[in-house]
């Protein structure tokens, strides 16, 4: 017997949301391992605040995280290896970090994909300036996505499923085609969606390695001596 469920509404997803729903589907099926870390960034925040006071610049904390990730991955490049077929791994020498950058579009803020190429060869200042330049530049068409990729992600179901299966197959056949678009490592954060709260961030990613940054929060420290 069907019970009454009460009134409900049906809403159409915007094109942007449809694209991201299908893009996240590209990470399936993936054999993922998740790890939760808590890192003390007190000194880093203090140093950035000091530099901002000296220069008057708005420095990017994301740039600091990107530098740290790039240097760590450069020491263990196997974590950004990609399977080619079923019997070969491709190891990339450069750490190319794919991240989403908040872009001001009129009165709205939109997320746009960007890849910091060769991040392991760049300084904090270089990555910071690259991120700020992307934020200041006029928003590119399709939020930086190739036109063909956007069209595939907006295809009606079940065509979208077929296209995603073909993209996954091509990525396994030639991982360089995917890495050229999304980077070898993914970096994302809760950002503007989680202000005022603390917690963890978990997100699916098509990349072999992804870092999702939660939120900075004050916490009592025990067993720490001050000189």
Show the residue positions of the predicted features:
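C-terminal catalytic/motor cores of large multi-domain enzyme assemblies
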Residues: 1-227
């Amino acid at each position: 017997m069907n019970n009454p469920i009460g009134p409900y509404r049906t809403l159409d997803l915007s094109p942007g949301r449809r694209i991201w729903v299908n893009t996240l589907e590209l990470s399936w099926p993936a054999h993922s391992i998740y790890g939760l870390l808590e890192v003390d960034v007190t000194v880093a925040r203090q140093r950035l605040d000091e530099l901002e006071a000296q220069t008057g610049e708005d420095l990017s904390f994301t740039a600091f995280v990107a530098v740290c990730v790039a240097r760590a991955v450069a020491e263990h490049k196997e974590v950004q290896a990609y399977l080619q077929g079923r019997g070969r791994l491709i190891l990339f020498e450069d750490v190319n970090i794919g991240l989403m950058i908040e872009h001001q579009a009129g009165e709205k803020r939109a997320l746009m994909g960007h890849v910091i190429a060769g991040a392991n060869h760049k300084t904090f200042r270089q990555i910071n300036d690259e991120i700020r330049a992307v934020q200041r530049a006029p928003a590119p068409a399709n939020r930086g996505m190739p036109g063909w990729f956007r069209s595939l992600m907006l295809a009606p179901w079940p065509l979208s499923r077929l296209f995603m299966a073909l993209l996954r197959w091509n990525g396994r056949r030639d991982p360089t085609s995917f890495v050229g678009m999304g980077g070898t490592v993914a970096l994302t954060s809760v950002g503007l969606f989680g202000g005022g709260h603390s917690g963890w961030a978990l997100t699916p990613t098509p990349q072999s390695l992804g870092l999702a940054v939660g939120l900075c929060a004050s916490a009592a420290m025990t067993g720490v001596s001050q000189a």
